[in-house]
């Protein structure tokens, strides 16, 4: 059937058909059709959604997400035909029954996913099957290679090419803003692609965006890295391993992070940007993704094994993740804290130590320093101002202000100090509670929102002294953040009353 094309501004791949047209074509809700643009003869597939009112008879409405592959224009004539069920469905059902994917089956699934042949429910079924029944190392390798092949890849003539990654879960993780310039200043290449915050108070891409643009193509990333030695960019703006981004999108509502998918996701991005050397930070402890050291070692061995299969040398650092890195959480607060350290000012010990430790491992792996001297060399690069100079070079090549200073980042004018209710030592902080408070205050959307942690575990505080200060750009945001702080007890001081429980009599 030939119809006239209309469009709707949503990203979900879908085609809306009037119920009368759908009956004539012979499709039901959730079925898929092929869409051919008559002018170019280009054909794609998309899942069907049926409506009586949103699309009139004789018209088909596709989402912008669908049109990314069709490249049509509103008013074009298109041909719609019922499409057969893709082979991927049988492979997904096989995994549901406990089977194992072959390389060819994985390739078909990723191809169908990338070209929007699979519907959202079918992608969700794939993710759920892989989560419940798991992926062995062969399947993880297949998945990694196919995710890389689904998009653009970068190749550098100069070697080695370094990358770093953190498993996440720790607030205030701004170390990329120090690690990347240290590594680049040593003469190595580091094309760092980063993510935005999904559930956190600020992803690395959010932080870097306060300093410079972060959306670039793969070709631009290569050129900038070769000129400046490194970049810090948003991976979501590229066409690098796009199948991975799609899977993550469907994982998020389920709040699941399948182990095999996580391994493939990490390594696909590294492989696609041409990295041959990678340092991976695995934070452990309460509130992190990895509960203890034993589990951290298991994950590290899996990442190293996968790296060996892919030709990437991987070393992992199992680190303490029980409290924030540094004392600031929120975009401007974290950027200011990181730049302050690069400028040679005194900073939080946790931020300095972790940054030079991760950078130092990379320097040792690449032969820039001898064994056990990498951290010292990394600290020396910071102390001598080489890392600051390199960071300003990176900021400039990405389109930012090379004269920027740590004092150039304002915080929200609405503030609230959370005081200690008693004297004593801070026994713990709740990472997730701090993240929730910062997000309630407006971070990462409001760059001036967030919090400053005055006291960390092991430090003494007197009654009435500040535990943390909350910053917000809007009054109502501050009110929400205060409510979150009062109910979550983000900083625990020994002897403090957490709850009073009375009888009903």
From Swiss-Prot:
From the Swiss-Prot or TrEMBL record, give the protein name: AMP phosphorylase
Q: GO:BP terms for this protein? A: AMP catabolic process; pyrimidine deoxyribonucleoside metabolic process; pyrimidine nucleobase metabolic process
* UniProt-listed InterPro entries: AMP_phosphorylase, Glycosyl_Trfase_fam3, Glycosyl_Trfase_fam3_N_dom, Glycosyl_Trfase_fam3_N_dom_sf, Nuc_phospho_transferase, PYNP-like_C_sf, PYNP_C, Pyrmidine_PPase_CS
Which reaction does this chain catalyze? Answer: AMP + phosphate = alpha-D-ribose 1,5-bisphosphate + adenine; CMP + phosphate = cytosine + alpha-D-ribose 1,5-bisphosphate; UMP + phosphate = alpha-D-ribose 1,5-bisphosphate + uracil
State the superkingdom: Archaea
Its ancestry begins with: Archaea, Methanobacteriati, Methanobacteriota, Stenosarchaea group, Methanomicrobia
- Enzyme Commission designation: 2.4.2.57
- Drop me one GO molecular function for this one: 1,4-alpha-oligoglucan phosphorylase activity
The record's annotation in SMART domains points to: PYNP_C (SM00941)
Q: Which family does it belong to?
A: Belongs to the thymidine/pyrimidine-nucleoside phosphorylase family. Type 2 subfamily.
Q: Which GO terms describe its cellular component?
A: cytosol
Instruction: Write down the Pfam families for this protein, in alphabetical order.
Output: Glycos_trans_3N, Glycos_transf_3, PYNP_C
NCBIfam families this protein is in? AMP_phos, ARCH_P_rylase, PRK04350.1
Where do the catalytic residues lie? Answer: 257
**Top-level EC class:** transferase
